[in-house]
């Protein structure tokens, strides 16, 4: 069973700039933005998350690589993409993560797509799934019972990031194509809970 989350109005707040180092034009968000182009920005190159957790996307329409953005300062692309294999130097769309709940997050991982094969129940951060006993470097599918998670391609939270939430797809991610428009493989080797 997937637990539904409650979205509280005004819980998310983020300020973005079109130049690195918090310089240039500035805009504040309290809700999703499918394209900064509509605001007259070409891109976002620095940002500060003041409250809530967000997902930043490389392209408009919530497409391309995705990056979890938790409370803090991101003076340049290396602050949000420094651990990824192919960092995006800009972000052009954003949305809040409604179900982030670090204390009450539960995730089931499956060996094969469509929730088949061996499974593992997670409720903590795992910098290496292999170290916790998971065989191989791939996860076929996920079921998010509660909370929100960021899954990474390589151990130590490196490589491509995939954001999984209990309030998207009813918490069911049957195939890597549902992890994001940039997902091209079942390779996932580390997972962690997203913090508000």
Swiss-Prot record:
GO terms for biological process: camera-type eye development; visual perception. Residues 2-11 are annotated as: N-terminal arm. The modification N-acetylthreonine is found at residue 2. Residues 12-51, 52-98, 105-146, 147-195 form the Beta/gamma crystallin 'Greek key' domain. Residues 99-104 are annotated as: Connecting peptide. Gene3D superfamilies: Crystallins. It comes from the Eukaryota. Keywords: Acetylation, Eye lens protein, Repeat. Crystallins are the dominant structural components of the vertebrate eye lens. Belongs to the beta/gamma-crystallin family. Has a two-domain beta-structure, folded into four very similar Greek key motifs. PANTHER family: BETA-CRYSTALLIN A4, BETA/GAMMA CRYSTALLIN. Homo/heterodimer, or complexes of higher-order. The structure of beta-crystallin oligomers seems to be stabilized through interactions between the N-terminal arms. This is Beta-crystallin A4. It comes from Mus musculus. The gene is Cryba4.
